[in-house]
């Protein structure tokens, strides 16, 4: 996770918050076929230490890509988190990719906007084995030297992790180290989409 200048971060937060307000204004009664809204719930591992953590997500398709708007509350204040698109919501999580960062304000609220492919066609594929760059090699999760071959695997779930095990510990959570940040030394998962079936995560329902 790379820190940006504070001024830029504040401006981005204001713009994202404005976009969030517009995105959620329609409400569930005005949902269209090209957008979905759903909630993320607190993960089992964070239930005791962050019982009020939750998030609302809205995804709007423009056809060529989707805009995802996230509004999270009940998180520790001024804390960094990492957001992933994942195969299944709970451990072992399956195939996953690092979508971006989420940072809370002094009230423990966070707003974020991502643009990418977040619908029924979201998948990971590796037609063959190939060498992979080994950049972050610290234990316990060093970079792999090559990828495994896999047919297309659909990834319809979402998850949010503490960027740091210390941040987790400082907030009464387990200080378990996980690979879910840019340098593969994150804390535990905080939010996920386990309120949806394993094979039918929320992204599956968006079919523009």
Q: Which positions does each model-derived feature cover?
A:
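Bacterial N-terminal signal peptides that target proteins for export
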Residues: 1-10
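N-terminal leader/targeting pre-sequences
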Residues: 24-208
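C-terminal segment of classical bacterial N-terminal signal peptides
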Residues: 15-24
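Generic hydrophobic/packing signal
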Residues: 13-14, 66
């Amino acid at each position: 996770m790379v820190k940006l200048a504070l001024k830029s971060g504040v401006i981005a937060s204001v713009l994202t918050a404005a976009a969030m307000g517009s995105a959620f204004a329609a409400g569930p009664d005005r949902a269209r076929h090209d957008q979905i809204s759903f909630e993320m719930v607190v993960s089992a591992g964070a239930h005791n230490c962050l019982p009020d953590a939750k998030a609302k997500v809205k995804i709007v398709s423009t056809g060529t890509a989707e805009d995802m708007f996230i509004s999270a509350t009940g998180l520790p204040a001024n804390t960094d988190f990492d957001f992933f698109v994942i195969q299944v919501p709970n451990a072992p999580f399956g195939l996953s990719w690092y979508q971006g960062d989420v940072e809370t304000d002094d009230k423990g609220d966070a707003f974020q906007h991502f643009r990418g492919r977040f619908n029924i066609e979201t998948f990971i594929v590796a037609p063959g084995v190939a060498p992979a760059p080994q950049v972050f090699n610290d234990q316990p999760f060093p970079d792999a030297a090559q990828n495994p071959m896999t047919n297309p695997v659909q990834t319809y779930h979402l998850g949010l992790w503490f960027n740091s095990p210390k941040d987790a510990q400082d907030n009464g959570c387990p200080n378990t180290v996980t690979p879910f940040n840019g340098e593969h030394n994150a804390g535990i998962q905080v939010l996920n989409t386990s309120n949806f079936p394993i094979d039918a995560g929320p992204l599956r329902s968006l079919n523009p």
